[in-house]
């Protein structure tokens, strides 16, 4: 069970770096078995978990749910349902205590 945290300060430089991580790069590094190239396309991917979640040109859109984003941070919060601090911790590999 995830625990609720109170205010956590995140260094602005760390936050800027985290926001720059695109979803395709994140999946290639941390969830390669979840990344699937869409047949018949040159640069469109989806996830094994959600075939209607398409990734292309630095952005992603989950067609069956009607929302999308640009970064891995957006994906972890909107799709994987991590809170903001948990998502930052995943992307940095550090605890933000």
Q: What does each of the following model-derived ranges do?
A:
Residues 1-97:
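N-terminal structured subdomain of primase-like DNA metabolism proteins
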